[in-house]
Amino acid sequence: MNIMRTTMLLAFMTALFMGVGYLVGGGSGMVVALFIAGGLNFFSYWNSDKIVLRMYGAREVDEHSSPVYYRIVTKLAQRASLPQPKVYIINNAQPNAFATGRDPQNAAVAASTGLLKQLSAEEISGVMAHELAHIEHRDTLTMTLTATIAGAISMLGNFALLMGMGRQRNSSGNSQGAGMLGTVIALFVAPFAAMLVQMAISRTREYAADRRGAEICGNPLWLASALSKISGGGQTFYNEEAEHNPATAHMFIVNPLRGEGADSLFSTHPATENRIAALHKQAEKMAKEGNKGTKFAVENGLYRKHGNLEDEDLNPEAQNGFTHNQKKKTVRRGKDRPTWLRH
């Protein structure tokens, strides 16, 4: 159902783009618009991941420079039967993360320093599992294409304004009125409709990634707890890169822009409380079906809190990924974690 809906929305956006092209240049304008869309999507297909990672100043890490974070991603990718993605860290205090790449073989995940500092290993696992679900569903490609087409529609709308003004000087009567109507549609209606479609696709894919991510990590409550912590990040911490490039907001697990409100037509993401409620329902279902880890979490008020990854992955002096104090705390409680997450 999600695949069919996404396909229909993408087809609508392409038709909308061609329609704006027709308003600008008639039949030939529609054909040109189709070729432009194809060219932009071709470029985005091959280069969007590099552009976004460079835009946010992402730094690639490995098992030596960021051992625990990298190991979590590796283990989750194995559990999901996905190729090992490239792993990045963004130097930003706002807790957030995103995935990018044209397919599972050329994918990358990125987490902010704020997320690694503020979340526990379990919560980070939930977040990374969500991002891997996006990769598995090829949402990274879908959202890149929708963002590209939406941007192109806005660009054509501005061009239509200039064309419309020129035509009005050389026409009168009904033709002038028709030209004005076409300009209004191209400049305001089409970009607005494209924005709504882009946001609808984004919201649909977030719910699906939450469900699948919970299955990958094995405990929906890890992701629910992470979302609860991250949700206030857009208000508490300023994400300068995201504010300057709002077209990338849909990529993040939670909207990085300030002022994000209710679950509405104008939201890039579903309301966080709705996502958390859905994850709690999924946890209850998994517990009833015999998932021991989830059953323990439900019966004991979510999960047993463990230390975050600040010392392991952000302190260059940490030995083998742990400081002395962090190692003591992790070893003492490590037996409560699932085998794949024990350090």
Curated annotation (Swiss-Prot):
Binds 1 zinc ion per subunit. One of its GO terms (biological process) is proteolysis. It is found in: Cell inner membrane. The chain crosses the membrane at residues 7-24, 29-46, 145-165, 177-197. The keyword Protease applies. Its cofactor is Zn(2+). It is a multi-pass membrane protein. Signal peptide: none annotated. The active site is at residue 131. Its EC number is 3.4.24.-. GO terms for molecular function: metalloendopeptidase activity; zinc ion binding. Zn(2+) binds at residues 130, 134, 206. HAMAP family: Pept_M48_protease_HtpX. Belongs to the peptidase M48B family. This is Protease HtpX homolog. It comes from Bartonella bacilliformis (strain ATCC 35685 / KC583 / Herrer 020/F12,63).
